[in-house]
Structure formats: structure tokens, C-alpha cells
UniProtKB/Swiss-Prot annotation:
Protein name per UniProt: Isocitrate dehydrogenase kinase/phosphatase
Subcellular location: Cytoplasm
UniProt entry tagged with the keyword ATP-binding: yes
Family: Belongs to the AceK family.
One GO BP: glyoxylate cycle
MF annotations from Gene Ontology: [isocitrate dehydrogenase (NADP+)] kinase activity; AMP binding; ATP binding; phosphoprotein phosphatase activity; protein serine/threonine kinase activity
Keywords carried by this UniProt record: ATP-binding, Cytoplasm, Glyoxylate bypass, Hydrolase, Kinase, Nucleotide-binding, Protein phosphatase, Serine/threonine-protein kinase, Transferase, Tricarboxylic acid cycle
Keyword Membrane in annotation: no
Length: 579
């Protein structure tokens, strides 16, 4: 959108603003790429603690470069930081600099973040921000992402895969490249046998290798005569050497690999939008916002999530926001739009007993989640500030509770409600409701996976704190995921104790502990009392996961974690591993 010209001095200043913001984003992108590129060496040298440090450092970059850009702009703005006409013109100048760029949406989000910092924007400001609720920006990306394509001659699949592994070389050699290629070939032929004779006609893999935790992934597609399927080759570098560990061709397996309950990939992509377009061809049901987020572009993920939600929200003007299903929380009020799979979580002004933490501590827990390896068990929770909703869109019961319980987060502006801070997550079915609704076999499997989820988190130094079923949800792929973080802490911070043996009848019958319990004391032998599982499912969990109730297991694990010895947690089922 072009606006009337400003005086020559202001025109020059608008251009200087645009150039400064452009250069700041370029600097951010270069540093982002620099950290991401370290993932290859971390993988080669098995420097897993360094990889975790890189992941945390990369998340912090965005706000660091926004702050640095604001410092640079001081010399340009000269007291005109809140001149709307100047920023409107700067936006036009900035848009001109982005013409033809594949990733111009990332640049625009950076610009929007700056204007929101300067103007304290509540909702959106269409005059100075880049707003496009009615379009899908990736639809305009037609440039194909960089990839390798391999044709397959009949009977020569293993030979082709030997070449693939050679093209993706590392500083450490494959333990046995031909054997790896043969195992991959067998799995592909088994998985795709229903495609008929000679099912694999070609394979297409992104040039960029994806890294996360202890694995590297070659991500692409396998083509038959009339169809294609995802093809992800997982590489591992451990005591047995560098080798292919798994091949994923099922969309459900690949979707779980890219789940928003996992940590972000380290993938050194020169451009991101074209990679998102490619990944959407593999995962057609995966929202664009989650793909951007999983590639480490969390701010862009937030932008796309906002864009798609409010586009849907405006297209359904008669639908009201209501309380989300599930047991009301003592720390959060949670609401949703029934037709859209997101929930919005607001911190209550006061917490019911026995919750004793402060509001700042709750916010700190949600920030901590970004720094952890979430290993498919912690749902991504993005913070949003100053969201604006029409007051009429809230159900009366929801609006009343927000006004009485979340007044610190809520304000009214005419016919609108402003939310100062909320956390937005994918909506899952709460586990306590799911177990009641399912047939016994499905409920049994979910209960066992709930136990596995607690173990997976523990092995990555995560203790949920509150193990009640209502704090877990079930994904589309029937996977138990934790999503309520107000009591989450690190395993290494806990004191795992044996439950004392009562010495007297009075102690044995006491309703409360007869001994001192410190704020970090945890008693695994008592977990069964706080899980809320029906007796048959509880017995199944005890049988399948007995270590959960053994304080010695927790103390041994704690000792390993303190020595930086993190057990491996593969992101796929044992059945997907190669022979």
C-alpha cells in the first residue's frame, strides 16, 4: 500500500529505517544459520550437550536481534519512534526491498515485531503492520526447494542407495555403507510392496540434512509409477558407528517426527518457505504454522497460526468462544473455538490451594519448556500478547469467568476484549476424558502410553510435577502428551525419597505425612495415588512400567543425568528400525 509522500528528510529517514530493519534481519538470519550449521559437527562428534546448548541459544536469537535493531534505529529515528506516518512510509520502502524474496514473510514478521514494540500494539495495526489474513503466503512460492533426485533401475535399488549415502557424507565414515543401503532397500520394498512390481521408480531427497537430538534425517519422497510417499532415512552415530537406523514411509510416522510436541529441527536451509511447501506435500494435514515452527522459525509459526485462526474466526461470525473440555484448572482458564483445534490458556489471578507458585513462576515454567528436548511428550505452547477479540464472541459463562478470575490479563476496549498474555496450544482430547470414552483396548493402550510418556520425559530430565490424567492429552496418533506446565521441573532438581515405614499405629493411620516433607521431595511409591487411573489400568501401568514407582530407579536416573548421560529416546516405534 502506497501512502502520500513525506517531506524529503522524512522520506530519507523512512528509507533508512527500512534498510536498517532489513540489515538487522539479515544479521539475525546469518547468526541463525551459523548456529544451525554446527549441528553437523555436533552429530559427527556426538556432542549431544553442545547440541542442546545450540538449540537454546538459537531460540534466544530473535529477541536479541530485535533489541539490537532498536538500538540501531535510535540514531535514525531521532525522537520520531512513534511517528505513524513515518512508519507507514517505512513499511512501503521495506516492502520494496523484499520484492522477489522467497522468505519475505519472515522479513515482514520481523518488521511487525519491531512496530509492536514501539507502539505497544493491541490486536493488529493494519496501517503500520504487514497484515494478510485472507491469503496463504506459501501459495505464492513456486520455486522448488533444492533437492537430489535419484532414478532407480529395476533390481538396482541398493546400488542407488549406496550412491545416496555417499552423497550425504560426514566427517565420520559409515560403519558399513553397502549393508546400510541394502537394509534401507529391503524396508522400502516391504513397505511399498502393495504398489506392485518394481514399486520404487525414483527417490527425491532435500539437499539439507535435518538434525535433532542424536539423529540426522534425510527427508524426501519415494515415487512409484502412479503415486508417491514420504521417505525419511534416519541416521544415527553411536558406539556402533554411523549407520542408517530407520526408514519412515508412512505419513503418520513422519507426522509424529514433525510433531509440535518435539523440539525444533536444526536444518540449515538457505530459504525456508520453499521447504515448507515441500514438507506440506508430504504432510498435507500438517498446518503451515507447525512446519515453520518445527524448522526453528517459531515467530513465523506464531504469525501463521494467528493468520489462519483469525481468518477462520472471521469466517464463522456466529460461533462463540467457550470453555475447553476437561477439568477446570487451578492455575489456568482454558477456552477454545469449537470448530478450530486450538486452545487459549490464561493464567488466573489467584491459584486455589494447594498451588503455591506465583504468576511469574508459571510464566517461567512455560519459558523453560522451550529450552528442553521435548521428545514428543511436551506440547508446544506459544505465548501471545495483546490479542483482541470481540466481546460478543465470548459465551456469557466464559466471559464472566475471565472477568472474575483473569482480570490481570484482561481489559476491555469498547466492544473488544484485550488479552495481555495467553498461551496457545494445539487442542487435544484430555486423557481423563479419553479413557472414559474409549473401548477397553484403546483405553488400555492409552494408559500404558501415559506411563511411557512419564518415563520418556524423565529420561530427558523432565518431571511433570502433577501426574493427574487431566494434564495429559491424546494426539491424533494416539500418543500421550503432557501440556500443563505450572509444576514442571527438572529431574535433577528433585529429591526422590523412599516413603518411611510407620513406626506406630497412629502413623500408619495418619491422613497426612507424620514426617517433614521438603518442597522438592518426591515419593515415587505414592504416585499411584495421584494418577487417577481406574484400578485395571493402574495395574497394567504398574506391570508395564514398574520402575516409575521405584525411588531407586529415579535416583539412578538422576545420577546419570547429572553426569550428562542422557538415555536415548528414539522418535519412532521399535518396528520402524532396520534389521
Amino acid at each position: 500500500m502506497n501512502h502520500p509522500s513525506l517531506p524529503p528528510q522524512s522520506e530519507r529517514r523512512a528509507l533508512a529505517i527500512a534498510q536498517a530493519v532489513y540489515e538487522a534481519f539479515e544479521d539475525y538470519h546469518a547468526r541463525f544459520s551459523e548456529i544451525t550449521a554446527c549441528a553437523k559437527q555436533r552429530f559427527e562428534t556426538r556432542d549431544w550437550s553442545g547440541a542442546r546448548e545450540d538449540a537454546v541459544a538459537r531460540i534466544a536469537l530473535y529477541d536479541q536481534y530485535i533489541a539490537e535493531c532498536m538500538l540501531r534505529l535510535r540514531a535514525v529515528l531521532l525522537g520520531q519512534a512513534h511517528d505513524r506516518a513515518l512508519w507507514m512510509r517505512a513499511r512501503d520502502r521495506y516492502a520494496a526491498l523484499l520484492s522477489g524474496l522467497i522468505d519475505q514473510e519472515l522479513y515482514k514478521t520481523f518488521y511487525n515485531t519491531l512496530t509492536r514494540r514501539y507502539f505497544g500494539t493491541h490486536g493488529v495495526d493494519a496501517d503500520i503492520e504487514f497484515i494478510a489474513l485472507d491469503i496463504e503466503p506459501t501459495d505464492a512460492i513456486t520455486v522448488p526447494v533444492a533437492r537430489h533426485t535419484y532414478a532407480v533401475s529395476p533390481g538396482r535399488l541398493t546400488d542407488m542407495l549406496v550412491r545416496v549415502l555417499g552423497d550425504y557424507a560426514f566427517a565420520v565414515p559409515y560403519a558399513h555403507r553397502t549393508r546400510c543401503a541394502a537394509a534401507i532397500a529391503v524396508r522400502l520394498l516391504d513397505d511399498l510392496a502393495h504398489w506392485g512390481e518394481h514399486p520404487v521408480r525414483s527417490v527425491e531427497l532435500l539437499e539439507t540434512v535435518f538434525y535433532r537430538e542424536r539423529r540426522a534425517y534425510l527427508v524426501g519422497r519415494v515415487f512409484g509409477e502412479h503415486r508417491f510417499s514420504p521417505c525419511v532415512i534416519a541416521l544415527i552415530n553411536d558406539d556402533a558407528g554411523l549407520r542408517a537406523e530407520a526408514v519412515l514411509t508412512r505419513r503418520s510416522d513422519v507426522a509424529q517426527l514433525f510433531s509440535n510436541s518435539r523440539s525444533y529441527f536444526q536444518a540449515d536451509l538457505s530459504t525456508v518457505g520453499d521447504a515448507v511447501v515441500f514438507l506440506r506435500s508430504l504432510l498435507t494435514h500438517k498446518p503451515v504454522d507447525e512446519l515453520y515452527t518445527m524448522l526453528g522459525r517459531a515467530k513465523q509459526g506464531k504469525t501463521e497460526r494467528y493468520r489462519t485462526f483469525f481468518s477462520h474466526f472471521q469466517a464463522h461470525p456466529s460461533e462463540q468462544l467457550v470453555h475447553a473440555d476437561g477439568t477446570p484448572g487451578m492455575v489456568m482458564v482454558v477456552f477454545t473455538l469449537p470448530s478450530y483445534p486450538l486452545v487459549f490458556k490464561l493464567i488466573r489471578d489467584r491459584f486455589a490451594y494447594p498451588k503455591t507458585m506465583s504468576r511469574a513462576q508459571v510464566e517461567g515454567k512455560y519459558e523453560l519448556v522451550f529450552q528442553l528436548d521435548r521428545i514428543g511428550r511436551l506440547l508446544d505452547a506459544q505465548p501471545y500478547r495483546f490479542l483482541r477479540f470481540p466481546k460478543a464472541r465470548f459465551s456469557p459463562a466464559l466471559l464472566q469467568e475471565l472477568q472474575t478470575s483473569c482480570a490481570m490479563s484482561l481489559s476491555e476496549d469498547g466492544d473488544d476484549v484485550l488479552i495481555a498474555l495467553c498461551y496457545v496450544q494445539r487442542r487435544l482430547r484430555p486423557l481423563n476424558l479419553y479413557l472414559r470414552e474409549q473401548l477397553p483396548e484403546a483405553a488400555h493402550a492409552a494408559a500404558l502410553d501415559y506411563g511411557q510418556a512419564i518415563k520418556d520425559m524423565a529420561r530427558n530430565n523432565i518431571f511433570p510435577g502433577d501426574m493427574l490424567l487431566k494434564n495429559f492429552g491424546i494426539t491424533r496418533h494416539q500418543r500421550a502428551v503432557f501440556y500443563d506446565y505450572d509444576e514442571l521441573c527438572l529431574i535433577t532438581e528433585c529429591n526422590f525419597r523412599d516413603w518411611p515405614t510407620p513406626a506406630t499405629y497412629e502413623e500408619q493411620m495418619a491422613a497426612e505425612p507424620w514426617f517433614h516433607v521438603g518442597p522438592r521431595d518426591v515419593f515415587p511409591e505414592r504416585f499411584a495415588l495421584f494418577m487417577g487411573l481406574p484400578s485395571s489400568q493402574l495395574e497394567a501401568v504398574k506391570h508395564q512400567h514398574p520402575e516409575l514407582f521405584d525411588p531407586r530407579w529415579w535416583r539412578d536416573l538422576q545420577s546419570r543425568l547429572r553426569d550428562d548421560d542422557y538415555p536415548d529416546t528414539p522418535p519412532y516405534a521399535e518396528s520402524r528400525r532396520l534389521a
